[in-house]
Amino acid sequence: MDTNADDGLNNVGSKEITPILKEVTEDAIRGDEVIESLKVKADSEDITPEERKRNVKKLAGAISHSLRGRGEINVRCFGSASIGKGVKAIAIARSYIGVQNLQLDCSPAFITTMMGENELTGICFVTFASERQGKQDTKDSDIIGKCKSVLMVKADPKDISAEDRKINVKKLAGAIAHAIEEGKKTVVRCFGNATIGKASKAIAIARGYVAVRGFDLYCWPSFIVADMNGKERTGICFYVYSNESE
């Protein structure tokens, strides 16, 4: 379990979700089951890259199947490794349901759970499907490429204090909310689970900031590739927007 899962940020700006739906853990997924709430399990550190990819695709299949069946699913994650895995699965699920001319969007919110005597804070991605808007052949990469506002998430140092970590997440949340206020949408780029987790928490907090003006914040993740020091690296970008732009 990621020690950064419980950072106390659920008290800042974002509405906390109380789970009322029947929850299925990742290990209990059946291929034909429509799931209301899915708890993502972090992979073990010694897992092979092939097994890691297989696990993400299994999650993506469960998410997309449930979206087709009931239109919505809660994807619950605790810790950066779990959040990163969940976000990647959601990104793949978006491409899966796109074949049926459906689009996937989500809203992250803070959640809590008890593990023994400890209360852990995590992220729930309220993920939903709707009929795709605009031209059916529009690629996500084209939508992302047209967005002029781009934020790059920087990983925090490993020795950073818990308080400084919270401050950095709130700063990022403020930047996201400001970008939304200025241009109604922004792209948040992440490389590595630590930055994906940081961005997810920041978006959840930014929802609270945007809500003050009477709007809500939504997003969808997509894979990106960048050249870093001569090596190709795959990351995640969140396309973030508010219903003010609708």
Predicted regions: what they are:
Residues 1-25, 30:
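Long, polar low-complexity intrinsically disordered regions
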Residues 4, 10-11, 55, 74, ...:
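Detector for Asparagine
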Residues 19-23, 31-72, 77-80, 84-96, ...:
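Conserved mixed alpha/beta catalytic, RNA-binding, or beta-rich assembly cores of soluble enzyme
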Residues 96-101, 208-214:
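Short hydrophobic/aromatic-enriched beta-strand-loop microsegments
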Residues 102-140, 215-246:
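C-terminal edge-of-domain segments
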